[in-house]
Amino acid sequence: KAADEASSFKQECAELKSKTEKLVGLLRQAARASSDLYERPTCRIIDDTEQVLDKALSLVLKCRANGLMKRVFTIIPAAAFRKMSSQLENSIGDVSWLLRVSASGDDRDDEYLGLPPIAANEPILCLIWEQIAILYTGSLENRSDAAASLVSLARDNDRYGKLIIEEGGVGPLLKLLKEGKMEGQENAAKAIGLLGRDPESVEHMIHAGVCTVFAKILKEGPMKVQAVTAWAVSELAANYPKCQDLFAQHNIIRLLVSHLAFETIQEHSKYAIASHKATSIHAVVMASSNNSTVKVAVDEDHQSQISHPMGNQTPNQMHNVVTSTMAMNGGVKLPQKLGNNHVRSNSQGNVKQFHHIYYQPQQNGSMSGVNMKGRELEDPATKAYMKAMAARALWHLAKGNSSICRSITESRALLCFAVLLEKGSDDVQFNSAMALMEITAVAERDTDLRRSAFKPNSHACKLVVDQLLKIIEKADSELLIPCIKAIGNLARTFRATETRMIAPLVKLLDEREAEVSKEAAIALTKFACTDNYLHLDHSKAIITAGGAKHLIQLVYFGEQIVQLRALVLLCYIALHVPDSEELAQAEVLTVLEWASKQSYMTQDETIDTLLQEAKSRLELYQSRGSRGFH
């Protein structure tokens, strides 16, 4: 109407009117489809369009000025109409794109939607909007592809991940994870794991209901999706430790332990061991062991006294008994190859198969609420990946959290970790070692947890320690450092007579890698420090194993990160066993006197105090000894 009443620039006003009518027609379409429009770009586009229409109206109203004086004082540059025409064109393009991108899967064309003018300065934003819109309205196949695109974007750049969250991508990703086909679910789980890179992002996902969806998938989803979901749990827990308890409240700890236990250890009946198979295995085991008793743990998940399913059989004996019996009964085929690390050949070409307790699930059984249907038919690589990701998730959930560590240790997880440390694939072994390292670190600080979970007479604890020591004795694995730390964390749980872990740790003091020597020194310090009730016994064991000479070498010639750790350990040994003949012969007092003159070694007040005490004790006892000898 204002354009029709214009008294100047009539042609330009008519052009603006034509474009405005076209824009209004598009806005009416948008209003009719408002419930289907993707909210984030809709808000921005409608706000911009409203401003453009206000400016267009203001410009046209100026052209209605009547009278010479009004026209003189109302100066309208010709460029203003060109600029306004361009802005209206942009708004038409934006609203047209919004209608296309918000169309349902059936109405959407497969052709490229183009770049809306509003996103010209930030084209990646347009791509994110487009993919999220597909997640809202596309077919399941298109939604899967859109999730894969978001995975690629989130992996490439942290800022893109932030944009995906800000533009409302979490909700439709969770919906796809819950309702999509397997490939779409995998892509959605990957995207969620990649998006949870900082506390704010994870908190946003928690509010969006990620815990509930993850619990549902870990209970009922396909194993491949469950494995990626377990990985996503580990990512979220690693980047926002405050979400650990929320995951625990949704039963995720128990579900992860169930995945870890599947085909790993013989379980209570709730873990679905077929009774007729168990009976036949039991009979053969009893005959094989010359009528000795094989005690199988049947505790509930929340009891801590656990007996190993192998009883008093060696692992290889148990493996032979179980696999041969099940092969005879037609329960399962003997495994040929389970991933890269399940079958290894030695130089003579003989094949050593890692023992693995297989069993036939009951038809209607369920494993702690996990859907068992078809799980035994999954390929070995998927099963191994599932275990690796379950262990990884438990590792990050356990870190620094006493209540979760208690839940884990009261379940079958310790037995699982012990078995998987020996025979799992590389990833499974590493994640199991890291989980044990974190659980033992919490137990070191939490007396109640340490006493309940790592009692000296606990069969599960013994098995864990055995496996940790095997890895430490081999000393050629990436598992070495987490295993050293785990043994050090358990230093207060060992009896005075149990010194078998000292010698392997002392041997590592002579390791070429500084990091290994440092961790070995830290672990031994936990045995020899005053806080350890058995510090005297452990200090003597370190001396007997030849620790003094290695420590002297490290204090004199080690890298700086090792020197201080070695000095602290040497001080504790000198403090507790000052009358040792070995220390006197090794001239430890001379070493301590030299160290006390090195400024960088005495900067720490605690170390300086310990050093002076150790020197005083050695001087006192060794001066007495010298008088006795002469």
Label each PLM-derived region with a short phrase.
Residues 303, 310-393:
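Intrinsically disordered, low-complexity acidic Ser/Thr-rich regulatory segments
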Residues 1-7, 24-41, 61, 65-73, ...:
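Short, charged/polar, low-complexity loop and linker segments
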Residues 3-36, 149, 153-168:
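Alpha-helical solenoid scaffolds in large eukaryotic transport, assembly, and signaling factors
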Residues 6-13, 33-44, 65-75, 163, ...:
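Short, surface-exposed loop/turn segments at secondary-structure junctions
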Residues 1-8, 77-155, 339-377, 615-630:
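N-terminal "cap/leader" segments of large eukaryotic alpha-helical scaffolds
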Residues 117-196, 203, 207, 215, ...:
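Eukaryotic intrinsically disordered, low-complexity regions
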Residues 130-132, 172-174, 205, 213-216, ...:
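Buried hydrophobic core positions in alpha-solenoid tandem helical repeats
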Residues 1, 10-22, 45-55, 62-65, ...:
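Alpha-helical solenoid repeats of the armadillo/HEAT superfamily
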